[in-house]
Design a protein with these regions (language model features):
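Short S/T/G/P-rich N-terminal loop/turn motif that feeds into the first structured element of a domain
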Residues: 1-232
């Protein structure tokens, strides 16, 4: 695999069949760096198959979490390799930053995107997650459609916002949004009411959508990226 500068992955690339996403709780900015450096080192020396297209590590701006976002051509090989590589990564992380906890990996497929090709390169990635009370692929898509309809009805997009990419988990229970922003301040300003994020009846309906049991938003910065398959 080739090391690359920490640039944003191409979320819409057509050969990305699945995204494997995992969240880690680090607790401090220093432990975030230790976790990412350890995981990055373990992956760089691994025999990674060409079906891994990209792997990106993001650190939350509050110093609490790390997110890994891996693009693969197919889910089966992704999950198989992730189990093998996961042991090496966990050992490396435990040696460098003991006590870090991780959530189970979740498989997603991109469903829809709202592109802003004129937007500048993102300095902040806002990850939103929604979990439902059971599997229902139609409900996942209906929720995303509602949100995108609400965003498209805005009179003018927020100046700091970029493209937004909505994913559905392959088990039918979750939705993940990957939103690009110029910087953290732009997103904070928008959600505080000086922009359009969170305004309007469509967004209100999305928040009150039946069956939602958990939802959250976290702001991240891209820290490390590795490209496979000749990409990134």
């Amino acid at each position: 695999m080739d090391q690359s500068a920490p640039v944003a992955p191409d979320i819409t690339r057509p050969d990305a069949g699945v995204a494997i996403v995992r969240e880690f709780v680090a607790g401090t900015a220093g432990r975030q760096r230790d976790l990412i450096d350890a995981a990055f080192g373990a992956v760089r020396v691994a025999a990674v198959p060409p079906t891994l297209l990209s792997l990106t590590w993001l650190a939350s701006t509050d110093g609490e979490k790390v997110l890994s976002y891996a693009q693969w051509t197919a889910e089966d090989e992704a999950l198989l390799f992730s189990r093998v590589l996961g042991t090496s990564v966990q050992q490396a992380v435990a040696a460098r930053a003991p006590g870090i906890t991780a959530s189970p990996a979740v498989s997603y497929r991109r469903y829809r995107s709202a592109a802003r090709p004129d937007a500048p390169p993102p300095g902040c990635i806002v990850i939103g997650t929604v979990e439902f009370d059971g599997p229902d692929a139609d409900r996942q898509r209906a929720w995303i459609d509602l949100v995108l309809d609400a965003l498209e009805s805005e009179p003018a997009p927020d100046a700091g916002g970029g493209s937004r990419h909505f994913h559905v988990s392959t088990d039918g229970t979750r939705v993940l949004s990957y939103a690009e922003w110029i910087d953290e301040a732009s997103h904070l300003e928008a959600v505080a009411g000086d922009g359009t994020v969170g305004d309007g009846s469509g967004v209100a309906r999305a928040r009150a959508f039946p069956g939602i049991v958990r939802a959250g938003v976290t702001r991240y910065r891209i820290e490390r990226a590795i490209a496979g398959g000749g990409a990134l």
